[in-house]
């Protein structure tokens, strides 16, 4: 160890000690930061699209559909729990509708989550499969669901309702809230809310729409 010659006066001694402590502190901090930022995971962490498998099933299921009969051969009836408004009170009920068969479990999970939510979102009208004579509409293949059309309208670029009346989230219990249970339950599973379309469609949720 090298000898350190301290000056006799107290001021010099204090300065030397401070320098030694400062150097030791910087060395310790450097070691800590090096350990923090030099960490490397043992293996690559995969982060796949959680909806990829289901999207592929849907794609395979509808690729050969060209007629109403073919579309309806791929549908199933589902029954889900819902809330209704009766005499100003929310009561539990069930709703039955048709949906593409490979989406049935997904749809059941969505409505069970909505039903268990604090919001207790009430459903007055629900449309699942509906033959529109065109495959531009996902309703024709059972890939879309509309909720309470009157209170969740489709509007043009000027905000004028094309279908339905008015959207009043927060004041009208049938209107879908952007940050509510309904939107969260659908979008977390890869469904797209029509409010994000250029022609906003607040009632509409479609699976794997681009």
Give residue ranges: language-model regions.
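Structured beta-strand-rich cores of soluble
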Residues: 33-64
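Active-site acidic/histidine clusters and adjacent loop/turn architecture
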Residues: 58-126
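Active-site-adjacent loop/helix surface patches within enzyme catalytic domains
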Residues: 109-146, 151-154
């Amino acid at each position: 160890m090298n000898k350190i010659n301290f000056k006799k006066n107290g001021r010099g001694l204090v300065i030397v000690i401070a320098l030694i402590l400062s150097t030791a502190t910087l060395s310790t901090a450097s070691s800590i930061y090096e350990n923090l930022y030099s960490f490397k995971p043992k293996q690559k962490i995969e982060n796949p699209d959680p909806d990829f498998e289901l999207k592929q099933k849907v794609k395979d299921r509808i690729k050969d559909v060209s007629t109403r009969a073919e579309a309806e051969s791929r549908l199933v009836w589902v029954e889900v729990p819902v809330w209704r408004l009766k005499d100003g009170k929310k009561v539990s009920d069930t709703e039955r509708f048709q949906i593409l068969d490979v989406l049935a479990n997904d749809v059941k999970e969505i409505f069970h989550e909505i039903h268990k939510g604090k919001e207790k979102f009430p459903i007055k009208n629900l449309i699942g499969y509906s033959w529109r004579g065109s495959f531009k509409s996902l309703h024709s293949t059972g890939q879309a669901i509309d909720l309470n059309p009157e209170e969740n309208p489709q509007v043009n670029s000027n905000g004028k309702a094309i279908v339905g009346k008015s959207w009043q989230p927060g004041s009208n219990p049938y209107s879908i809230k952007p940050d509510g249970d309904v939107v969260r339950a659908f979008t977390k599973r890869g469904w797209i809310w029509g409010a994000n379309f250029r022609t906003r469609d607040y009632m509409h949720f479609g699976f794997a729409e681009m």
